[in-house]
């Protein structure tokens, strides 16, 4: 994107990219069909269905779950190391080593992609109430847009801190007035969106709609947001609802949820959908050296009997010079055309969040916190914790965060977990990397700073 990234995101996202699903019945059929004018588009239920599909499509972007989040969240953490200063012109290496300049194009393009997605959802929510169609379907479309917008802003605020909070479709003139809102304002908007989504979304889908956001996914994401804000008591009811619903469960083996032949399984609450062939695959671990460079300390953190250890081992790719982590291995893939879905919310994540929240509200030597934590451990073939081993709130907190690292490795959680628990600087120090305190959030892309040219309302993050 050029220097008008955010401005362009709010004026061209619908006509240039949003309607990638026109005339398609299956929301995974993401081939472009038409690019109608936005002013004339939102007239029927089918129009809104296509627009919602376009919002899902945005998440697939190479600048989000299709690639760059891997750099921004995993390579930034103590899970993955980029050892090649020349990798992608140094873009990933600089992020891995906390020396990225404000002109880093990974940051610029991810920012632009996230705000393009925000505008897609804004346009849906702006226009949907003015069109008459089935109330249940309308509520679902609103819920899907609210869920996706909440997820987009959750990623924005965790990556950059204060960000522009834009909740309506805008013009270039409007965009020039945007300011960077406080983190608390952004989180309040996320909570509002996800709370509404818990009501508007159905619990399950059938047929071609399986894989869309559900009320359970909205509850889990809302709980994750609340825990990030340290609102542990508020998160517990949402997590308890998911656990008690009976809709989700741990699969028998830790690797089962990731199999390309096992999509939409009972452990997945929400995943970004990919499908090998044409425009619908991804190249997450291909064409990079990151797949080759799992941090040795991550592998060392697993006990030998842990069934999750092989998932972070590198696997040679047929007919390709690269290797990929087994967790995301697709034996039928080719470079940049991988069919694995990318998990955003898994039931194992829910159980660990539930254990964490319960412990933060009050440590107990028995009960649901230990039960939830140990369910994840025993599925992995490692011994359950006892109250003798984990005897205090502090010890339990450490145990949960360590378990999250082992269970959710390479799933775009580790850096966020380190930052929210205040342990990022110490964790990276163990890998030989010194993290300046200001680099717990990324610099605002320089292109945004330049185009706004307003140090009062649109300042750079401190220290950059």
Where are these regions (language model features)?
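Conserved, well-structured interaction surfaces
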Residues: 37, 49-53, 57-63, 85-160, ...
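Acidic, glycine-rich segments characteristic of secretory precursors and extracytoplasmic regions
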Residues: 2, 23-74, 123, 184, ...
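Long, intrinsically disordered, low-complexity segments
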Residues: 22-23, 56, 64, 77-88, ...
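Sec-dependent bacterial lipoprotein signal peptides
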Residues: 1-21
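Short, surface-exposed recognition loops and adjoining beta-strand edges that mediate ligand/DNA contacts
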Residues: 39, 66-88, 166-168, 201-284, ...
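TPR-repeat structural position
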Residues: 232, 364-366
């Amino acid at each position: 994107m050029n220097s008008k990234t955010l401005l362009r995101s709010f004026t061209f996202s619908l006509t240039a990219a949003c309607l990638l699903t026109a005339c398609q019945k299956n929301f995974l059929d993401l081939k472009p069909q038409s690019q109608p004018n936005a002013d004339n588009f939102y007239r029927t239920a089918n129009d809104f269905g296509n627009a919602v599909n376009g919002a899902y499509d945005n998440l697939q972007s190479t600048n989000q779950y299709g690639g760059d989040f891997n750099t921004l969240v995993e390579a930034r953490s103590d899970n993955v190391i980029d050892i090649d200063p020349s990798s992608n012109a140094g873009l990933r290496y600089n992020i891995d080593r906390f020396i990225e300049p404000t002109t880093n194009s990974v940051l610029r393009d991810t920012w632009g992609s996230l705000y393009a997605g925000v505008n897609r959802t804004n346009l849906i929510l702006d226009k949907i109430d003015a069109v008459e169609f089935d109330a249940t379907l309308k509520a679902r479309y609103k819920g899907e847009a609210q869920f996706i917008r909440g997820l987009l802003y959750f990623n924005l605020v965790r990556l950059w801190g204060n960000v522009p909070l834009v909740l309506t479709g805008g013009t270039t003139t409007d965009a020039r007035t945007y300011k960077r809102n406080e983190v608390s304002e952004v989180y309040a908007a996320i909570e509002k969106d996800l709370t509404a989504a818990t009501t508007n979304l159905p619990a399950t889908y059938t047929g071609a709609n399986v894989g869309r956001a559900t009320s359970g996914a909205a509850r889990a994401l809302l709980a994750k947001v609340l825990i990030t804000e340290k609102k542990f008591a508020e998160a517990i009811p949402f997590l308890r609802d998911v656990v008690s619903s009976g809709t989700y469960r741990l699969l028998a083996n830790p690797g089962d949820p990731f199999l390309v032949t096992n999509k939409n399984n009972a452990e997945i609450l929400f995943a970004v959908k990919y499908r090998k062939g044409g425009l619908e695959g991804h190249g997450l671990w291909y064409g990079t050296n990151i797949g080759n460079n799992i941090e040795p300390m991550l592998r060392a953190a697993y006990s030998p009997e842990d069934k999750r250890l092989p998932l972070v081992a590198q696997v040679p790719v047929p007919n390709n010079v690269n290797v990929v982590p087994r967790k995301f291995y697709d034996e039928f893939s080719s470079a940049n055309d991988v069919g694995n879905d990318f998990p955003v919310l898994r039931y194992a994540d829910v159980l660990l969040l539930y254990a964490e929240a319960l412990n933060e509200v009050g440590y107990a030597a028995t009960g649901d916190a230990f039960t939830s934590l140990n369910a994840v451990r025993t599925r992995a073939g490692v011994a359950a914790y006892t109250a003798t081993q984990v005897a205090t709130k502090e010890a339990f907190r450490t145990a949960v965060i360590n378990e999250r690292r082992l269970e959710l490795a390479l799933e775009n959680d580790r850096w966020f977990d380190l930052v929210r628990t205040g342990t990022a600087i110490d964790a990276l120090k163990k890998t030989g990397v010194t993290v300046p305190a200001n680099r717990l959030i990324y610099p605002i892309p320089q292109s945004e700073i330049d185009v706004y040219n307003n140090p009062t309302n649109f300042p750079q993050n401190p220290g950059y």
